[in-house]
């Protein structure tokens, strides 16, 4: 049995899921209590603030950061450790981006996607039939 992999810790990068800054990345700078943490984000225009753990999701990215680091230090470490690019290259970020693109499709675009999926499914079925026949 495997335990938790994502712990609430200083330097853990989080994704905000509720409130005004939904979808923004931030990093835990300090732990206030068992329900709240101080977060800061140099990547997006996002003020340093205390936020509830229920309003964020912990990501797999952890920065090396001293406890209670000020915004300037956080910004330097953020750039040095290339957090924005690590996030952008993750499957999670790609899935969120795809979901956003899919939600903005109009009716004709959804129809075109359906046709392409049908074509792909047909090609797969033909290939499987050939493989079984051979």
Swiss-Prot record:
One of its GO terms (molecular function) is structural constituent of ribosome. It is found in: Cytoplasm; Nucleus. The keyword Cell membrane does not apply. GO terms for cellular component: cytosol; cytosolic large ribosomal subunit; nucleus; preribosome. One of its GO terms (biological process) is cytoplasmic translation. Its main location: cytoplasm. Coiled coil: none annotated. Keywords: Cytoplasm, Nucleus, Ribonucleoprotein, Ribosomal protein. Component of the large ribosomal subunit (LSU). Mature yeast ribosomes consist of a small (40S) and a large (60S) subunit. The 40S small subunit contains 1 molecule of ribosomal RNA (18S rRNA) and at least 33 different proteins. The large 60S subunit contains 3 rRNA molecules (25S, 5.8S and 5S rRNA) and at least 46 different proteins. Belongs to the eukaryotic ribosomal protein eL14 family. Component of the ribosome, a large ribonucleoprotein complex responsible for the synthesis of proteins in the cell. The small ribosomal subunit (SSU) binds messenger RNAs (mRNAs) and translates the encoded message by selecting cognate aminoacyl-transfer RNA (tRNA) molecules. The large subunit (LSU) contains the ribosomal catalytic site termed the peptidyl transferase center (PTC), which catalyzes the formation of peptide bonds, thereby polymerizing the amino acids delivered by tRNAs into a polypeptide chain. This is Large ribosomal subunit protein eL14. The lineage of its organism: Eukaryota, Fungi, Dikarya, Ascomycota, Taphrinomycotina.
């Amino acid at each position: 049995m495997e335990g938790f992999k994502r712990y609430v810790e200083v330097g853990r990068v989080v994704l905000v899921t509720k409130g005004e800054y939904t979808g923004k990345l931030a990093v835990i700078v300090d732990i206030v209590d068992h329900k709240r943490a101080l977060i800061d984000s140099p990547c997006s225009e996002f003020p340093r603030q205390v936020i509830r753990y229920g309003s964020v999701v912990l990501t797999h990215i952890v920065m090396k950061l001293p406890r209670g680091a000020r915004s300037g230090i956080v910004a330097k470490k953020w750039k040095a450790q290339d957090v924005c690019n690590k996030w952008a290259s993750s499957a999670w970020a790609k899935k969120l981006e795809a979901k956003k693109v899919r939600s903005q499709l109009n009716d004709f675009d959804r129809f075109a996607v359906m046709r392409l999926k049908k074509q792909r499914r047909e090609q797969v079925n033909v290939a499987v039939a050939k493989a079984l026949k051979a």
